[in-house]
Amino acid sequence: MGTLTTSLVVPSKLNNEQQSSIFIHKTRRKCKKNQSIVPVARLFGPAIFEASKLKVLFLGVDEEKHPGKLPRTYTLTHSDITSKLTLAISQTINNSQLQGWYNRLQRDEVVAEWKKVKGKMSLHVHCHISGGHFMLDLFARLRNYIFCKELPVVLKAFVHGDENLLRNYPELQEALVWVYFHSNIQEFNKVECWGPLRDATSPSSSSGGVGGVKSTSFTSNSNKKWELPKPCEEACACCFPPVSVMPWLSSNLDGVGEENGTIQQGLQEQQS
């Protein structure tokens, strides 16, 4: 995922070694008077998934067990030092990845869980936009942009890391992806449907939306197909797990959830 800071300005003409760096902080001492100066930052470049930079950990789960029978979650974190991603696949969120002052300050992790609701599988992805400390609030709009831009990369990491599961159960590629943006700012506190997993891993070719992703608001009554799944109120066999494996989301974040009446829904439109 992209870092939350931008780089310094540098000359537009760089040698090959300099161009290979994502963030460049050095400038030439001698520059021509008319040489143009441009900002260089991966933040505004394309979101690209690199499998070689992904480390996958299976913690207490069967690589091929259907998530409709055994809880399955994803915890994805990014290192700004190594630029590598770590994906933990387990029955509950891997809290050890989220420890430490730096992780609590950045809050750039993405967590997700598979759910079966009334017999249909769906993937529920959670991102923390703001809330917790003032720095996150100050850069809420930028963080929202980055998460939207990088989410296709995140979803590709899930698909690549859990490829055996998806190979054995290809129907999971048709499962809807619901993205929860948690924020103490109403504008960014929302839920969006990014469509089937197979489509959500590809950013829209349209440049009209945030990060190349064009979303439009809709009401649950306008299209039943995209209605946010609601589990049965009583014990049943068609919903699993019976309770979310992420109870901390509702207790620690004053954000998304039907219980507080602040849900906003959106639908990602994939443009061909």
From Swiss-Prot:
Subcellular location: Plastid, Chloroplast
Pfam families, A to Z: Staygreen
Transit peptide listed as a keyword: yes
GO BP annotations listed: chlorophyll catabolic process
Region (Disordered): 201-222
One GO cellular component term: chloroplast
Top-rank taxon: Eukaryota
Induction cue: Induced by drougt stress in leaves and stems.
Keyword Chloroplast assigned: yes
Entry keyword set: Chloroplast, Plastid, Transit peptide
Location, primary (coarse class): plastid
Subunit annotation: Interacts with PSY1.
Task of the protein: Required to trigger chlorophyll degradation during leaf senescence and fruit ripening. Binds directly PSY1 to regulate the accumulation of lycopene and beta-carotene in the maturing fruits.
Note: Plants silencing SGR1 exhibit a stay-green leaf phenotype during leaf senescence, and a red-brown fruit phenotype in mature fruit. Plants silencing SGR1 exhibit altered development of fruit pericarp cells.
Protein name: Protein STAY-GREEN 1, chloroplastic
Protein source organism: Solanum lycopersicum
